[in-house]
Regions:
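DUTPase catalytic domain/fold
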Residues: 1-207
Protein backbone atom coordinates (compact mmCIF):
# COMPACT_ATOMS: atom_id res chain seq x y z
CA UNK A 1 0.00 0.00 0.00
CA UNK A 2 1.04 3.61 -0.52
CA UNK A 3 -0.49 6.88 0.72
CA UNK A 4 -1.97 9.30 -1.79
CA UNK A 5 -0.29 12.68 -2.00
CA UNK A 6 -2.01 16.07 -2.25
CA UNK A 7 -2.15 16.02 -6.06
CA UNK A 8 -3.47 12.43 -6.12
CA UNK A 9 -6.13 13.25 -3.54
CA UNK A 10 -7.30 16.19 -5.64
CA UNK A 11 -7.30 14.10 -8.81
CA UNK A 12 -9.38 11.36 -7.20
CA UNK A 13 -11.85 13.87 -5.78
CA UNK A 14 -12.28 15.30 -9.26
CA UNK A 15 -12.78 11.90 -10.92
CA UNK A 16 -15.22 10.77 -8.22
CA UNK A 17 -13.13 8.04 -6.58
CA UNK A 18 -12.91 10.02 -3.32
CA UNK A 19 -16.02 11.47 -1.69
CA UNK A 20 -15.19 14.65 0.22
CA UNK A 21 -18.54 16.30 0.93
CA UNK A 22 -18.28 19.33 3.19
CA UNK A 23 -14.51 19.55 2.78
CA UNK A 24 -13.03 23.00 2.16
CA UNK A 25 -9.89 23.40 0.00
CA UNK A 26 -7.78 24.35 3.02
CA UNK A 27 -8.62 21.02 4.68
CA UNK A 28 -6.75 19.07 1.99
CA UNK A 29 -3.17 18.61 3.20
CA UNK A 30 -0.04 17.00 1.73
CA UNK A 31 -1.15 13.40 2.39
CA UNK A 32 -4.57 13.59 4.06
CA UNK A 33 -7.81 15.53 4.55
CA UNK A 34 -8.49 17.24 7.88
CA UNK A 35 -11.85 16.49 9.52
CA UNK A 36 -13.78 18.31 12.22
CA UNK A 37 -15.98 17.30 15.15
CA UNK A 38 -19.70 16.96 14.40
CA UNK A 39 -22.57 18.55 16.31
CA UNK A 40 -23.66 15.67 18.58
CA UNK A 41 -21.82 13.28 20.88
CA UNK A 42 -23.04 10.20 22.73
CA UNK A 43 -21.67 9.41 26.19
CA UNK A 44 -22.03 5.94 27.66
CA UNK A 45 -23.99 6.51 30.86
CA UNK A 46 -21.84 4.21 33.00
CA UNK A 47 -18.68 6.10 31.97
CA UNK A 48 -19.89 9.35 33.60
CA UNK A 49 -18.14 9.77 36.96
CA UNK A 50 -18.77 12.26 39.76
CA UNK A 51 -16.35 15.19 39.72
CA UNK A 52 -16.13 18.10 42.17
CA UNK A 53 -14.36 20.22 39.56
CA UNK A 54 -17.15 19.69 37.02
CA UNK A 55 -19.98 19.36 39.53
CA UNK A 56 -22.43 21.60 37.64
CA UNK A 57 -21.89 19.71 34.40
CA UNK A 58 -22.30 16.40 36.26
CA UNK A 59 -25.66 17.53 37.66
CA UNK A 60 -26.73 18.76 34.24
CA UNK A 61 -25.88 15.40 32.67
CA UNK A 62 -27.68 13.38 35.33
CA UNK A 63 -30.83 15.48 35.60
CA UNK A 64 -31.21 17.48 32.36
CA UNK A 65 -29.35 15.94 29.42
CA UNK A 66 -31.24 13.86 26.88
CA UNK A 67 -30.96 10.11 27.44
CA UNK A 68 -31.45 7.47 24.79
CA UNK A 69 -31.39 3.67 24.88
CA UNK A 70 -29.99 1.73 21.95
CA UNK A 71 -29.72 -2.06 21.88
CA UNK A 72 -29.79 -2.22 25.67
CA UNK A 73 -27.13 0.47 26.18
CA UNK A 74 -27.82 3.86 27.79
CA UNK A 75 -26.33 7.06 26.36
CA UNK A 76 -26.45 10.77 27.04
CA UNK A 77 -26.96 12.60 23.73
CA UNK A 78 -25.24 16.01 23.88
CA UNK A 79 -25.39 18.83 21.34
CA UNK A 80 -22.02 20.56 21.15
CA UNK A 81 -21.79 24.33 20.93
CA UNK A 82 -19.07 26.19 19.04
CA UNK A 83 -18.87 28.95 21.64
CA UNK A 84 -19.50 27.11 24.93
CA UNK A 85 -17.40 23.96 25.41
CA UNK A 86 -18.45 20.63 26.86
CA UNK A 87 -15.84 19.21 29.22
CA UNK A 88 -14.92 15.59 28.55
CA UNK A 89 -13.22 14.21 31.65
CA UNK A 90 -11.03 11.13 32.22
CA UNK A 91 -13.05 7.94 32.27
CA UNK A 92 -15.66 9.13 29.79
CA UNK A 93 -16.26 7.04 26.70
CA UNK A 94 -17.70 9.19 23.93
CA UNK A 95 -18.94 8.38 20.44
CA UNK A 96 -18.56 11.39 18.17
CA UNK A 97 -18.47 11.82 14.40
CA UNK A 98 -16.95 13.97 11.69
CA UNK A 99 -18.80 16.90 10.15
CA UNK A 100 -17.70 15.71 6.74
CA UNK A 101 -19.01 12.84 4.63
CA UNK A 102 -15.78 11.36 3.37
CA UNK A 103 -14.36 8.13 1.96
CA UNK A 104 -14.07 6.25 -1.32
CA UNK A 105 -16.39 4.61 -3.84
CA UNK A 106 -16.58 0.93 -4.75
CA UNK A 107 -14.21 -0.11 -7.52
CA UNK A 108 -11.76 2.69 -6.75
CA UNK A 109 -9.14 0.45 -5.06
CA UNK A 110 -8.66 3.24 -2.53
CA UNK A 111 -8.88 2.50 1.18
CA UNK A 112 -9.68 5.41 3.54
CA UNK A 113 -8.44 5.44 7.14
CA UNK A 114 -8.69 7.80 10.11
CA UNK A 115 -5.90 9.05 12.36
CA UNK A 116 -6.13 11.46 15.27
CA UNK A 117 -4.34 14.78 14.74
CA UNK A 118 -1.19 15.05 16.85
CA UNK A 119 -2.50 18.27 18.42
CA UNK A 120 -5.66 16.43 19.50
CA UNK A 121 -3.54 13.69 21.07
CA UNK A 122 -1.41 16.27 22.89
CA UNK A 123 -4.57 17.81 24.32
CA UNK A 124 -5.31 14.44 25.94
CA UNK A 125 -7.78 12.96 23.46
CA UNK A 126 -7.29 9.25 22.84
CA UNK A 127 -8.54 7.23 19.87
CA UNK A 128 -8.17 3.43 19.60
CA UNK A 129 -7.22 1.52 16.48
CA UNK A 130 -10.74 1.47 15.00
CA UNK A 131 -9.90 3.89 12.21
CA UNK A 132 -9.47 1.50 9.30
CA UNK A 133 -11.99 2.01 6.53
CA UNK A 134 -12.70 -0.21 3.54
CA UNK A 135 -12.91 0.38 -0.19
CA UNK A 136 -16.38 1.76 -0.91
CA UNK A 137 -16.95 3.22 2.56
CA UNK A 138 -17.92 6.88 2.73
CA UNK A 139 -19.90 8.48 5.51
CA UNK A 140 -19.53 10.65 8.55
CA UNK A 141 -16.86 8.75 10.47
CA UNK A 142 -17.61 7.52 13.98
CA UNK A 143 -14.91 8.52 16.48
CA UNK A 144 -14.53 6.39 19.61
CA UNK A 145 -12.89 8.80 22.06
CA UNK A 146 -11.50 8.55 25.59
CA UNK A 147 -9.62 11.18 27.57
CA UNK A 148 -6.40 11.24 29.61
CA UNK A 149 -7.10 14.70 31.08
CA UNK A 150 -10.10 17.09 31.02
CA UNK A 151 -10.59 18.32 27.44
CA UNK A 152 -12.87 21.00 26.01
CA UNK A 153 -14.99 19.81 23.09
CA UNK A 154 -16.67 22.19 20.66
CA UNK A 155 -18.65 21.64 17.49
CA UNK A 156 -16.26 22.10 14.58
CA UNK A 157 -13.03 21.34 16.46
CA UNK A 158 -10.27 19.99 14.24
CA UNK A 159 -9.94 16.42 15.48
CA UNK A 160 -8.35 14.14 12.90
CA UNK A 161 -7.42 13.35 9.34
CA UNK A 162 -8.43 10.87 6.66
CA UNK A 163 -5.71 9.40 4.47
CA UNK A 164 -5.95 7.06 1.50
CA UNK A 165 -4.03 3.93 0.49
CA UNK A 166 -4.07 2.04 -2.78
CA UNK A 167 -5.22 -1.60 -2.61
CA UNK A 168 -3.93 -4.36 -4.88
CA UNK A 169 -6.53 -6.66 -6.43
CA UNK A 170 -10.30 -6.27 -6.69
CA UNK A 171 -11.85 -5.65 -3.26
CA UNK A 172 -15.62 -5.77 -2.85
CA UNK A 173 -17.74 -2.66 -2.24
CA UNK A 174 -18.26 -1.98 1.48
CA UNK A 175 -21.85 -0.87 0.84
CA UNK A 176 -22.70 -4.43 -0.29
CA UNK A 177 -22.01 -6.01 3.10
CA UNK A 178 -20.84 -3.38 5.59
CA UNK A 179 -22.41 -2.90 9.01
CA UNK A 180 -22.48 0.90 8.94
CA UNK A 181 -23.31 1.80 5.33
CA UNK A 182 -25.69 0.14 2.91
CA UNK A 183 -26.27 3.12 0.59
CA UNK A 184 -23.85 3.96 -2.22
CA UNK A 185 -25.64 7.15 -3.31
CA UNK A 186 -24.29 10.22 -1.49
CA UNK A 187 -27.43 12.33 -1.87
CA UNK A 188 -29.63 9.59 -0.44
CA UNK A 189 -27.13 8.82 2.34
CA UNK A 190 -27.08 12.48 3.45
CA UNK A 191 -30.87 12.73 3.34
CA UNK A 192 -31.35 9.65 5.52
CA UNK A 193 -28.39 10.07 7.87
CA UNK A 194 -29.01 10.80 11.55
CA UNK A 195 -26.60 11.02 14.52
CA UNK A 196 -27.88 7.76 16.02
CA UNK A 197 -26.43 5.95 12.99
CA UNK A 198 -23.02 5.90 14.69
CA UNK A 199 -24.24 3.80 17.62
CA UNK A 200 -23.13 0.13 17.67
CA UNK A 201 -24.88 -1.77 14.90
CA UNK A 202 -25.53 -5.42 14.26
CA UNK A 203 -22.18 -7.10 13.66
CA UNK A 204 -22.51 -9.09 10.45
CA UNK A 205 -19.16 -10.89 10.37
CA UNK A 206 -19.59 -13.12 13.42
CA UNK A 207 -18.72 -16.78 12.79
Amino acid sequence: MSHLSYSEILKNIENGNIIADGVKPEQIKDQSIDVNLGRYIFIREESVKFSFKFFKQYLWLIFVAKRIEFKGLEYFMIELNHNKPFWAIPGMFILAYTNEFIGTVGGSNLQPSFKLKSTSARRGIQHPLAGLGEVGFFNRWCLELTFAVPVELRHGDLVGQIYFDTVIGKPSDYADKGSYQSISDLKKLKAEWQPEDILPGNIKNVL
